[in-house]
């Protein structure tokens, strides 16, 4: 079953010159429930724009986007914000963790936004996620006192705390060295697969992308399916 349907969309931005730069024109893509999809492509090819569109952060000029049966292009701002908070978890290259908060508190922020103020259920879930990601012993460490790789693990746990159906990850290991990048990506991949989440990851690292069920390669002039990994069941 397709959980994400991007139907014939067009997306453009207005440049400082006043002209419009078209990122996508008549672009369509379907992603199955539980699929792990990697988005690759050179800088400027539209990876981040596509992540923002799927993540309901950015709007489109034309076309339709259906996520888990809902036409999100028909929702107003409040409806879209509620839908996004319920259905989608985000991981960004710049993790945007909050200074002055410890590891556990940073993970719990999405649940607090939903109105669950440090409820035992969410605290336990956060502790389990952090333990699975290898930093369970640093729950109460201030966020500035952990390494870059550990911060990215916190960002992964934060994205999963509300049990979203879909994870959108834009260059989630882009700021890490190759060794830590591979370690964190593998932890992330295994956890997402174990939880049965649908995941879309933008990455410039083809070695990491090869773990995906499917790789979508974006180029300035066209979008094409680059390859289907051997482990794909789709």
Task: State each model region's role.
Residues 142-146, 150-152:
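Conserved ABC ATPase signature
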Residues 63-71:
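Conserved ABC transporter NBD signature motif
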Residues 40-42:
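The feature captures the beta-strand-to-loop junction immediately N-terminal to the Walker
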Residues 161-165:
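A short, proline-enriched helix->beta-strand linker immediately N-terminal to the Walker B motif
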């Amino acid at each position: 079953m397709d959980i994400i349907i991007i139907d014939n969309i067009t997306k453009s931005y207005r440049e400082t010159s006043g002209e419009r730069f078209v990122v996508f024109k008549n672009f369509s893509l379907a992603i199955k429930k539980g699929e792990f999809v990697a988005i690759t492509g050179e800088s400027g090819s539209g990876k981040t724009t596509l992540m923002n569109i799927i993540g309901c952060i950015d709007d489109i000029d034309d076309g339709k986007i259906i996520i888990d049966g809902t036409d999100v292009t028909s929702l107003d701002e409040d409806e879209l914000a509620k839908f996004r908070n319920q259905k989608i978890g985000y991981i960004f290259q710049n993790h945007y963790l909050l200074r002055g908060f410890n590891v556990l508190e940073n993970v719990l922020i999405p649940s607090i936004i939903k109105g669950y103020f440090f409820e035992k259920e969410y605290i336990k879930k956060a502790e389990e996620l952090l333990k699975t990601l290898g930093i369970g012993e640093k729950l109460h460490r201030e966020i500035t006192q952990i390494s870059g790789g550990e911060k990215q693990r916190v960002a992964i746990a934060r994205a999963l705390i509300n049990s979203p159906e879909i994870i959108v990850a834009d260059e989630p290991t882009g700021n890490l060295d190759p060794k830590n990048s591979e370690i964190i990506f593998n932890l992330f991949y295994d956890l997402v697969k174990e939880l049965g989440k649908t995941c879309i990851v933008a990455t410039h690292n083809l070695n990491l992308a090869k773990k995906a069920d499917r790789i979508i390669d974006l180029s300035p002039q066209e979008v094409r399916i680059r390859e289907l990994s051997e482990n794909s069941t789709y």
